């Protein structure tokens, strides 16, 4: 599923291609690209849930969290998110790339991946996908993009 998500993100979003594609057309294109139908369906459902998450009632309890409060991870989150991943999420929040709401959406989407162990690179791409889909997060998306691509180009600040 993650390979399908990466393909979609790089093909349609990061390349500024036409994002308004019919689901059947998209499914056919992904099948022609060699992806399994089940994996395509999982990825499209993952994206649909992402699109719906920022409109949910999550904002009510996230907005109520106090400034400077610390996120405590549930056992199932600790099992899937390494110390490195949790530390990077904290860094992104402290750098104001993520806020409490986008952090929670990222964690939700990460746990929905069908990967037993979530790696730091997986987290970075999911953060970019989340920020791209949350209205008003354009600056945060640009900051995250710079973090991801500067690091992969070997540029150290």
Curated annotation (Swiss-Prot):
PANTHER family: PROTEIN SMG. The gene is smg. InterPro entries: Smg. This is Protein Smg homolog. Belongs to the Smg family. Disulfide bonds: none annotated.
